[in-house]
Amino acid sequence: MTRQSTVDQNQSTYNAKNFITKERQESKLDIDQLNVFLENGEQEAKLTHDLIEEIINDPILKTDTDHYDITKSQEREITARRIARLSLYMEHDVKTKQREFKDDLVKNLERKDSKLLTNKDLSIFDRRLSLVANIDPGLSTRIGVHLGLFGNCIKGNGTDEQIHYWLQEKGALLLKGIYGCFAMTELGHGSNVAQLQTTATYDPSSDTFKINTPDLLATKWWIGGAAHSATHTTAYARLIVNGKDYGVKTFVVPLRDEKTLNLLPGIMIGDIGAKMGRDGIDNGWIQFKNVVIPRQFMLQRFTKVIPGSPPKVQTQPLLDQISGYSALLSGRVNMVMDSFRFGSKFAIIATRYAVGRQQFGPEGNETQLIDYPLHQYRVLPQLALCYLVAPTAHKLMGTYISTLMELHQAGADKAKLINVSNKLKDLFIDSASLKATNTWLVAKLIDDLRQTCGGHGYSSYNGFGKGYNDWVVQCTWEGDNNILSLTSAKSIVKKFADISRGKNTTVTTDSLKYLTPQFIGKSLSKDLTFKFDNKKDFTEIWAVMIIRLIHHVVELISKGTKIDSLSKTLVQISKFHAIHSMLLTYQDKLNNESEASVKDAYTKGYLWKLYELFSLYFIDQHLGEFLLLKVVTSDQMSQVLQPRLLQLLPEIRKECIALTDAFKLPDAMINAPIGYYDGDIYHNYFNEVTNNNKLEPDGAGRPPYYPLLTSMLGRDDFQNRLGGSFESETLDSLLK
């Protein structure tokens, strides 16, 4: 509790908002065109705006700064209430997409002859969930685990009949009937899925499986939704038939009674407890003891157990391989979109604060933070990152949806399955690389931008603390970033090696088109130089860097170096692949008049400036590698690249407020008073602090534990506590 302010808040010294008002008045950027560019089209921009308005005006979903003060228990309850609220939107969103409002959607889906809902049918709700994640990531995850992990595991591994039964007849796809979680990770294994220890042993006498947790390390761990809410799980377990281990497969296992939520026989579940962030998620642990499920609860698109004497296991190797690529793609693709939306929020906060905040300089006319060159270097490249990731996020999502559609349409056609398998492999490379790189970059963005806001960035009410704690789990779950980077890089290196040997290698995505004999030869030429007199150079230099890094790795391996000892370089290859992919997608979009939606030349010019800044900033960040592999020379760096970088910063600074406005995020989505639209950082911040920490009637500010303080301050002199008798020698030693 604090004493009420005695300061006149209308004094003219509170002028932070004047700076932002002035910047907006002087801006020449077309905000609407920028927003359409960021949202991937006019209709998409309108949909995003409409959904945001619904979210911030919904009394259950809207989030204020008092959310930063709630306890874990309160957050769990709020999250449950919001899940129930979002379930009401879901049916409406599907009907809106299908343009059918008369029929009872739930009953239609339950019919055995009903068509399976597609990703397109769910696209409006998916967008709603993506936007909700900006203000409540835990809420988005709770539903995302059910729809994205539980649901997509069934979609990816189940037969059409199983998909229809679990997702439509049982109601899961509309958050009805059952609630699912995803039991892959165990206490002893996470990334190494092949070594998971939970078992599913087939019993031919009853045509059932027995699910068991053989030891402590096999306990399912970190399972979102398990602690309190999930009625079912998709469990990853080792298929055991006739004593033979067929590896890890997927099974639907009931956990709780659907009506009472009481645990079923053989199920033991506990709460993981406090975490760094996302306390709205009820992460739990699960142990199984002789849990019996019907054979039909094994997801059988790729592997089947055929009853008989003896029973047989039928596996389609190609399809089983596809299963390995498709299982976790959804989450990784969504995390790239999350990187765009979540990163944008903090770029807005830090940029607006940097414009409104003054520090040092003449009295009464101190310098705005954003006018310091170092501050520009700390803030503006992070803003550029948010612009660069947007087109890539939209493209990756589109590729993911179209590839999964091809997979389901391929049926048993081997040629089509081989084609879609190649696409899934390349999509795995891109999604793994982009997920890892962007979640790392946004984690760094949040903390770096927090520091640019000084002490005020440390306040919970300005969002950085909770934002960081909520975000960094993205660097670990659904594929640890280092493991994903290593895996994607090894796949890229293998493609390079195959091409170098003259082997026919399929490349299905634009981001990997640098893997051609012609470009490899060009990249390894000692005569290659970049003048940076055209836009293409800012992207191509990254492709050359990747080729030279890969060539370096391949040479070392050929001389006997173990590939694991080159892990640091492999992670760099993956990061550089992601940066190149983002630059290439952004460049292609700007060059495509029909896609870019930016007709105003001045506005388009600034999009190009952001493109150049992004490329140059990361070259500067990785200067050692570029110099070591002679992709650039020290003269180029000192005479061309760094001067251009330093030239771009003040140019972009001129329009930085308009560039934040283009995201069109209202204050209720930002939820940080130093980043609100009006720029009145001090009034907004002071008011939020005092509103959330109510004043005592007498303004005394005396805490409930005041006796501890008063007894300490009013304690006796130490002479009295020592009994009033001591030698001067003892006193001297005590006073030293």
Curated annotation (Swiss-Prot):
Gene3D superfamilies to which the protein is assigned, alphabetical: Acyl-CoA dehydrogenase/oxidase, N-terminal domain (1.10.540.10), Butyryl-CoA Dehydrogenase, subunit A, domain 2 (2.40.110.10), Butyryl-CoA Dehydrogenase, subunit A, domain 3 (1.20.140.10)
InterPro entries: ACOX_C_alpha1, Acyl-CoA_ox_N, Acyl-CoA_Oxase/DH_mid-dom, Acyl-CoA_Oxase/DH_mid-dom_sf, Acyl-CoA_oxidase, Acyl-CoA_oxidase_C, AcylCo_DH-like_C, AcylCoA_DH/ox_N_sf
Entry's Gene Ontology molecular function annotations: acyl-CoA oxidase activity; FAD binding; fatty acid binding
Enzyme class, first EC level, given as a word: oxidoreductase
Top-level taxon in the UniProt lineage: Eukaryota
GO terms under cellular component: peroxisome
Pfam family membership, one: Acyl-CoA_dh_M
Enzymatic reactions: a 2,3-saturated acyl-CoA + O2 = a (2E)-enoyl-CoA + H2O2
Cofactor requirements of the protein: FAD
Cell compartment(s), UniProt: Peroxisome
An annotated GO BP: lipid homeostasis
Sorted UniProt keywords: FAD, Fatty acid metabolism, Flavoprotein, Lipid metabolism, Oxidoreductase, Peroxisome
Family: Belongs to the acyl-CoA oxidase family.
Name recorded for this polypeptide: Acyl-coenzyme A oxidase
Organism: Kluyveromyces lactis (strain ATCC 8585 / CBS 2359 / DSM 70799 / NBRC 1267 / NRRL Y-1140 / WM37)
Organismal lineage: Eukaryota, Fungi, Dikarya, Ascomycota, Saccharomycotina
Gene this protein is translated from: POX1
